[in-house]
């Protein structure tokens, strides 16, 4: 069954709702964003997460020190990296790594070292999908997440089209730029129940 990651969580109610509804992964954004959480916030929110749900820290072009501090303080299970960074960094992190790519056409230079890959729209967090028809997964050898413009209305189609390891949503479960608890539940239900 396809796994679910709810990303950009910043409140206790959103974390608890996602966990209770059956999310497999929850994401805390440490990069510059309206969804950004401080290390202190992430630590408090992480304490609400049961051991059955994996905590992911989301970073853009991080340093090793940034990653290590967040892993330690927020007890992260995985890190998700966007942007430019030295591939050698992947070997220095003692957590599985999700390497994110903004899909702008044909895939090229896809990491063979990352534990997971994530494919997102050209502008992450925009609520827009990338061109699904142009996506060629023949060179992908790791489990992968699909993100970018997903919501309860299109997630089943995305799963049927890509057969991904997991789907990842942030803006698709928001109303007026805030996490919507009902949309979180509906999204997870659509994935888990195949509705």
UniProtKB/Swiss-Prot annotation:
Name recorded for this polypeptide: N-(5'-phosphoribosyl)anthranilate isomerase
Q: Which molecular-function annotations from GO does this UniProt entry contain?
A: phosphoribosylanthranilate isomerase activity
Q: What is the lineage of its organism?
A: Bacteria, Bacillati, Bacillota, Bacilli, Lactobacillales
Task: Provide the reaction this enzyme catalyses.
Answer: N-(5-phospho-beta-D-ribosyl)anthranilate = 1-(2-carboxyphenylamino)-1-deoxy-D-ribulose 5-phosphate
Under CDD domains, the record lists: PRAI
Q: Might you give the EC number(s) for this enzyme? A: 5.3.1.24
| GO annotation, biological process | L-tryptophan biosynthetic process
Ordered alphabetically, the record's keywords are: Amino-acid biosynthesis, Aromatic amino acid biosynthesis, Isomerase, Tryptophan biosynthesis
The protein's matches in Pfam families, at most eight in alphabetical order, are given as: PRAI
Q: Cite the InterPro entries for this sequence.
A: Aldolase_TIM (IPR013785), PRAI_dom (IPR001240), RibuloseP-bd_barrel (IPR011060), TrpF_fam (IPR044643)
Which protein family is it in? Answer: Belongs to the TrpF family.
**Originating species:** Streptococcus gordonii (strain Challis / ATCC 35105 / BCRC 15272 / CH1 / DL1 / V288)
